[in-house]
Swiss-Prot record:
Site residues by UniProt (Involved in polymerization): 450
SUPFAM superfamilies: Tubulin C-terminal domain-like, Tubulin nucleotide-binding domain-like
Protein name listed in UniProt: Tubulin alpha-3 chain
Cross-referenced InterPro entries: Alpha_tubulin, Tub_FtsZ_C, Tubulin, Tubulin/FtsZ-like_C, Tubulin/FtsZ_2-layer-sand-dom, Tubulin/FtsZ_GTPase_sf, Tubulin_C, Tubulin_CS
GO CC list: cytoplasm; microtubule
Underlying gene: TUBA3
GO molecular function ontology, one term from the record: structural constituent of cytoskeleton
Organism in which the protein naturally occurs: Zea mays
Length: 450
């Protein structure tokens, strides 16, 4: 089987994780205590959920996941929440003191004490798999744990499971909304290792998702659980083809094959359609063509950047629900004729499509409407560079004065690491510029790293 292990790191990773596992359970008819009611199993394919859940002798389903945080409060919510019986207590790992928004604490001092325990738990999960396909890593790069411990774990996973693919779902700092002063430092230091140690990284940012909730779901003041439920739909759509059957199934390794033209250029935009409230859905018939074109709307992107400022290199459309290949081909043909959606000249085809017959599931009482069909788009666009240049310029403003640097050095980092990471990101910006440039002839940049 093609199992995936999910690793949720830090507050953002864990809270997105909660939303995801809640949704997976609903999709597979698994109750919060891990049992599947008897009558369900007859119709279900037994192996459908084994990519994400392992089964115990007693018929209980346990997520192949691990939750790590350096301080206990967020994980304690899982330990006492609705799904407390779903997870094995050993899968919930928490430390005593947090990383205090400091990459160096997460990566060197405090993270170092907990990382071996985490890897040990991951090893147990991996031994339980017959054909481990890869890891899904959830974290945010603005804080201390998600950035510091997140990159430490990724580095160690690369060493121990070198060939397995690693997909990152990474929350990046928003342009306007900031949760900490040192976000730019943490993000730059963390992206430095994301560049090396993830195969595909899907960028998210809270502000973009707030705007989607406000605009499309009419939520005046969205909170994190609104955001996370939207993100969980995207992640569920991506992994649906691992868990259900469909006309065109896409597995994790296919993402990187189809989306990553050069190893470093692996930061993706994501969007999801239709995002629509129950009040409106009743009155709208959303055709495949409509949801496809709304997935390409700049306003649908889950990270603040404008795809019209860049060019698409590749794009992956994952449909689910009542969709047939004929409609998909027609919708894609329409997209190709649009002038606003530009592809680089060296990648003329550029579309990877997946279809899954399982209709989207919604969490009862949540804001999203139940719809017949939905699409999730993951695209590799050169406009992602906006996200990095924004963070880089904020980093430069602070680093020019060496503001706050002593907190990092005091935790055993060297100042050289700052400039090294910053140079790496400058090189990344340059890479994106070159890829976007006309005439795709490169001077031997093509050695693959795999």
């Amino acid at each position: 089987m093609r199992e995936c292990i999910s690793v949720h790191i830090g507050q953002a990773g864990i809270q997105v994780g909660n939303a995801c596992w809640e949704l997976y359970c609903l999709e597979h008819g698994i109750q919060p205590d891990g049992q599947v009611p008897g009558d369900k199993t007859a119709g279900h394919h037994d192996d459908a959920f084994s990519t994400f859940f392992s089964q115990t002798g007693a018929g209980k389903h346990v997520p192949r996941a691990i939750f790590v945080d350096l301080e206990p409060t967020v994980i304690d919510e899982v330990r006492t929440g609705t799904y407390r019986q779903l997870f094995h207590p050993e899968q919930l790992i928490s430390g005593k003191e947090d990383a205090a928004n400091n990459f160096a604490r997460g990566h060197y001092t405090i993270g170092k004490e907990i990382v071996d325990l985490c890897l040990d738990r991951i090893r147990k999960l991996a031994d339980n798999c017959t054909g481990l396909q890869g890891f899904l890593v959830f974290n945010a790069v603005g804080g201390g744990t998600g950035s510091g411990l997140g990159s430490l774990l990724l580095e160690r996973l690369s060493v121990e499971y070198g060939k397995k693919s690693k997909l990152g779902f990474t929350v990046y700092p928003s342009p306007q909304v900031s949760t900490s002063v040192v976000e730019p430092y943490n993000s730059v230091l963390s992206t430095h290792s994301l560049l090396e140690h993830t195969d595909v990284s899907i960028l998210l940012d809270n502000e973009a998702i707030y705007d989607i909730c406000r605009r499309s779901l009419d939520i005046e003041r969205p909170n994190y659980s609104n955001l996370n439920r939207l993100v969980s739909q995207v992640i569920s759509s991506l992994t649906a083809s691992l868990r259900f059957d469909g006309a065109l199934n896409v597995d994790v390794n296919e993402f990187q094959t189809n989306l990553v033209p050069y190893p470093r250029i692996h930061f993706m935009l994501s969007s999801y359609a239709p995002v629509i409230s129950s009040a409106k859905a009743f009155h709208e018939q959303l055709s495949v063509a409509e949801i496809t074109s709304s997935a390409f709307e700049p306003a649908s992107m889950m990270v603040k950047c404008d795809p019209r400022h860049g060019k698409y290199m590749a794009c992956c459309l994952m449909y689910r629900g009542d969709v047939v290949p004929k409609d998909v081909n027609a919708a894609v043909a329409t997209i190709k004729t649009k002038r606003t959606i530009q592809f680089v000249d060296w990648c003329p085809t550029g579309f990877k499509c997946g279809i899954n017959y399982q209709a989207p599931t919604v969490v009862p009482g949540a804001d999203l409407a139940k719809v017949q069909r939905a699409v999730c788009m993951i695209s590799n666009s050169t406009s992602v560079v906006e996200v990095f240049s924004r963070i880089n310029s904020k980093f430069d403003l602070m680093y020019a004065k060496r503001a706050f640097v002593h907190w990092y050095v005091g935790e055993g980092m060297e100042e050289g690491e700052f400039s090294e990471a910053r140079e790496d990101l400058a090189a990344l910006e340059k890479d994106y510029e070159e890829v976007a440039a006309e005439g795709g002839s490169d001077d031997g940049d093509e050695e693959e790293e795999y």
